[in-house]
């Protein structure tokens, strides 16, 4: 792994109606890592992810993605820079096929602008062919190729998690934020999903994930960060964090 962080969060603050959800939180994620973010419900984890992804504007602090300062940028600009996020509850387009869900998530698709259908029809057609080819590559990677023409609403919970990750990969991200990627997924598919994430990491991607499954966190993450009451209270290798008295008291429950 490179020595400098791919993501640097400095003193981020966010309050909702006087309740401070994120309280001067600072952390870093190294490139090529699988970094876990844990903490009790209400610790501010998902709020922090939404701030990083541009869905919430912070009240204070800075966020750097590589050399780019991204706090306050709209989500689509952050995605273009190479950072994307999946959702704890998949946001699939239920009435479209699995393949169509991926095509719509493709990066730099000329068909996104209606006017191009009239002034650049050839470019739109070429982009559609390119996006469909890329979508099939991703579906093969995520083992959903056999479901390409099925409606997304017909997928199981675990398959929808794979679809969510597949859609994220269509933007060719460098860093992927995963919000509880194995929540509600059966043990067999959990193993397959984490194997896939490990394979993607080996191919150059970085993952920062929120997860409550301690088996996944302790066995699959290189580094673990712990939040409590909006702040980072501990970080380190999984075995170190697991033995930290502050973590045991606030989250792991002894």
Regions found by a protein language model. Give the residues of each.
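Conserved ABC ATPase "signature" region
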Residues: 114-147, 195-198
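Catalytic Walker B motif of ABC-type/P-loop ATPase nucleotide-binding domains
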Residues: 176-180
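Helix-to-loop junction immediately C-terminal to a conserved catalytic motif
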Residues: 53
